[in-house]
C-alpha cells in the first residue's frame, strides 16, 4: 500500500536526520529537569504543578518538530509528486501525520517514566499522564500538520505556525490537566479521557482533509 510506503519512507528519512528527532526529546527532558531546580525543593508544590509541567514540555517539544513535517518535501519538489499518486491526498497527509506521531508522540510516551521519576509523580498520576499523552499527542500532530501545510511555502513561517496552532492546543491542554488533577485527588477521570478520545477521533478523521486543502492552497500560491 502507498499509505504504508509513505510511513516507511518518512521513518527512513528521519533516521538519517536523527538530530531532528532527538532535539525535541532532549528539550522535553531539559524542561522537566529544570523546573524542579527553579521552583525549589518543596515536594508539595512540585507534586501539585508537576503534571502540568509535563504537558507543557510535551506541547513545546511538539512545536519544535512540526516545521520539518512538509518542509523538505516542499523544497525538493517531492510534495508535488505525492499529490500526483493514485492515493488520495488526504490519505497521504494522514500517512505523514502518523509517521510524525511515531517519531515524536510515541517517544514522549516512552520517556514518561523518566519524567515521572524526575518530577516525583505517583504511579497513578504517571499512568494518567501516559493515557493523556496517548490520546492527546495525536491531536497535536494533526493540528500542527494543518498549520504546517498552511505555512509551508513561507520563508519564515515558524512564528506564524506557533500563532496558528498554539491556541488550538489549549482544549487538549485543559482536559489533559483536568485528568491529571483528578488522578492526583484520586477521583474518577473517565469523562475527561472520553472527551480527549473524542478529540483524537475527530482530529484523525477530519484533519487529513484540512491538510490536503491547505497543501493545495500553498502549492497554488
UniProtKB/Swiss-Prot annotation:
InterPro entries: Cyt_c_biogenesis_CcmB (IPR003544), Cyt_c_CcmB_bac (IPR026031)
UniProt cross-references to PANTHER family, sorted A to Z: CYTOCHROME C BIOGENESIS B-RELATED (PTHR30070:SF1), HEME EXPORTER PROTEIN B (PTHR30070)
Role noted for this protein: Required for the export of heme to the periplasm for the biogenesis of c-type cytochromes.
TM stretches of this protein: 21-41, 46-66, 101-121, 126-146, 157-177, 193-213
Membrane topology: Multi-pass membrane protein
Protein name: Heme exporter protein B
Keywords, ordered alphabetically: Cell inner membrane, Cell membrane, Cytochrome c-type biogenesis, Membrane, Transmembrane, Transmembrane helix, Transport
Pfam name, any one: CcmB
UniProt subcellular location: Cell inner membrane
Sequence similarity: Belongs to the CcmB/CycW/HelB family.
Gene Ontology BP annotations: cytochrome c biosynthetic process; cytochrome complex assembly
Primary localization class, coarse: membrane
GO MF annotations, alphabetized: heme transmembrane transporter activity
Organism encoding this protein: Haemophilus influenzae (strain ATCC 51907 / DSM 11121 / KW20 / Rd)
GO CC aspect terms: plasma membrane
Amino acid at each position: 500500500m502507498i499509505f504504508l510506503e509513505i510511513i516507511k519512507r518518512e521513518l527512513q528519512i528521519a533516521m538519517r536526520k536523527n538530530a531532528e528527532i532527538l532535539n525535541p526529546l532532549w528539550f522535553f527532558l531539559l524542561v522537566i529537569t529544570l523546573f524542579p531546580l527553579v521552583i525549589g525543593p518543596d515536594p508539595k508544590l512540585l507534586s501539585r504543578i508537576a503534571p502540568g509541567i509535563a504537558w507543557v514540555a510535551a506541547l513545546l517539544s511538539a512545536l519544535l518538530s512540526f516545521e520539518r513535517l512538509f518542509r523538505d518535501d516542499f523544497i525538493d519538489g517531492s510534495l508535488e509528486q505525492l499529490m500526483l499518486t493514485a492515493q488520495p491526498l488526504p490519505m497521504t497527509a494522514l500517512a505523514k501525520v502518523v509517521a510524525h506521531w511515531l517519531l515524536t508522540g510515541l517517544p514522549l510516551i516512552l520517556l514518561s517514566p523518566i519524567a515521572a521519576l524526575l518530577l516525583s509523580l505517583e504511579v497513578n498520576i504517571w499512568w494518567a499522564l501516559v493515557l493523556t499523552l496517548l490520546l492527546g499527542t495525536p491531536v497535536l500532530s494533526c493540528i500542527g500538520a494543518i498549520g504546517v501545510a498552511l505555512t509551508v511555502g513561507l520563508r519564515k513561517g515558524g512564528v506564524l505556525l506557533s500563532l496558528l496552532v498554539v491556541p488550538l492546543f489549549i482544549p487538549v491542554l485543559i482536559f489533559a490537566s483536568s485528568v491529571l488533577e483528578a488522578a492526583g485527588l484520586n477521583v474518577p477521570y473517565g469523562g475527561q479521557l472520553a472527551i480527549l478520545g473524542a478529540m483524537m477521533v475527530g482530529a484523525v478523521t477530519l484533519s487529513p482533509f484540512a491538510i490536503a486543502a491547505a497543501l493545495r492552497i500553498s502549492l497554488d500560491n
